[in-house]
């Protein structure tokens, strides 16, 4: 299963691939986050797409992964949160804006999903710009990392 954009293929990693990502991750916080994602996949096999690491692969350069994202589980209330990151060298090309728009629209087309949310570090202006460009607005709440956003769609 994959989501296709103009320039990328977006797809969830298999459990074995996620284990490799965890083994190769040097940042302790990311290693912990990826481990929790894998545990979510293993605990919720029928809903693993809502816990998996998703890669962002360039169409015109097969095998080149420019970043990744995840959904942070699907709540009983129909709310799913997204998180994302780009590799150095691939920023400022619009890849994340393209991916966030596509995954948000895809998520909202899935059974049980009523709302897509995100949270960013208060100082991560680039990430906030991605959210604003793709139809998110601040919902007035603060999370552990910073301001929270909710998808409102394009006007």
Model-flagged regions — what are they?
Residues 1-81, 86-89, 102-106, 110, ...:
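GNAT-family acyltransferases
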Residues 94-97:
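Glycine-rich acyl-CoA binding loop
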Residues 110-119:
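Conserved GNAT acetyl-CoA-binding A-motif
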Residues 131:
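Conserved active-site tyrosine of GNAT-family acetyltransferases
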């Amino acid at each position: 299963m994959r989501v296709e954009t103009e320039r990328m293929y977006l797809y969830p990693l298999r459990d074995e691939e996620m284990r490799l990502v965890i083994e190769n991750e040097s940042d302790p916080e990311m290693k912990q986050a990826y481990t929790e994602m894998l545990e979510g996949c293993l605990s919720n096999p029928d809903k693993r797409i809502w816990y998996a690491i998703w890669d962002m692969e360039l169409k015109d350069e097969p095998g080149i992964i420019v970043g990744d994202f995840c959904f942070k589980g699907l709540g009983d209330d129909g709310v799913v949160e997204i998180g994302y990151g780009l590799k150095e060298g691939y920023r400022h090309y619009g890849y994340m804006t393209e991916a966030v728009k596509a995954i948000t629209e895809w998520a909202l087309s899935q059974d049980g999903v009523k709302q897509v949310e995100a949270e960013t570090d208060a100082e991560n202006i680039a990430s906030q710009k991605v959210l604003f460009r793709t139809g998110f607005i601040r919902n007035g709440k603060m999370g552990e990392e910073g301001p929270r956003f909710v998808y409102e769609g394009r006007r």
